[in-house]
Amino acid sequence: MRTAQITRKTAETDISVEINLDGTGTYDNLTGVGFFDHMLDQLARHALMDMTVRCAGDLHIDDHHSVEDVGIALGQALTQAMGDKRGIRRYGECVLPMDDARVACALDLSGRPFLVWDVEMPTAKIGTFDTELVREFFQAFATHGGITLHLTQAAGVNSHHIAEAAFKATARALRDALEVDPRTADAIPSTKGSL
């Protein structure tokens, strides 16, 4: 079973993450940052990844440390749960519309982290949430998950819709990339023999 449990404790945050890559998309995420919890729920549900996240962070300062550190821990959990990546499809892509917004995600579970972020939020806030933290999450997640991750916005005027489209597109692309291909279930998806 492709599962992982990660704990990460610093002077700024105390985080636990549990994931099951072969789940049904159940989730129980409590970070103290309401909008971010909503985005994590979307990631779990649309990737069909069971996910439980707990974060106690220094929210009296701002949401930055909590959002970034959850991205770090979730990326570490993904890496652990994938193991040697035997049998996975490795690549995934999705163009996802959400009302006015359309965001494309293309990713490679290559072990070579890289983020291409071509997304612009028209507002600085979604409620009390700083929109710049969406990129911070994806940077941390890609770096610690070993993901080459490209997110490109083609349309959108509503920051909530743009952010949610980015999370959902990433989830759908992850779902495809993590799926085991029955034709190559015993093989590493690389001519190098490892990822």
Swiss-Prot record:
PROSITE patterns: IGP_DEHYDRATASE_1 (PS00954), IGP_DEHYDRATASE_2 (PS00955). NCBIfam families: PRK00951.1-5 (NF002109), PRK00951.2-1 (NF002111), PRK00951.2-4 (NF002114). It catalyses: D-erythro-1-(imidazol-4-yl)glycerol 3-phosphate = 3-(imidazol-4-yl)-2-oxopropyl phosphate + H2O. Belongs to the imidazoleglycerol-phosphate dehydratase family. It is found in: Cytoplasm. It is an enzyme of class 4 (lyase). GO terms for biological process: L-histidine biosynthetic process. GO terms for cellular component: cytoplasm. Its EC number is 4.2.1.19. Pathway: Amino-acid biosynthesis; L-histidine biosynthesis; L-histidine from 5-phospho-alpha-D-ribose 1-diphosphate: step 6/9. InterPro entries: IGPD_sf (IPR038494), ImidazoleglycerolP_deHydtase (IPR000807), ImidazoleglycerP_deHydtase_CS (IPR020565), Ribosomal_Su5_D2-typ_SF (IPR020568). One of its GO terms (molecular function) is imidazoleglycerol-phosphate dehydratase activity. Keywords: Amino-acid biosynthesis, Cytoplasm, Histidine biosynthesis, Lyase. CDD domains: IGPD. This is Imidazoleglycerol-phosphate dehydratase. It holds the Pfam family IGPD. SUPFAM superfamilies: Ribosomal protein S5 domain 2-like.
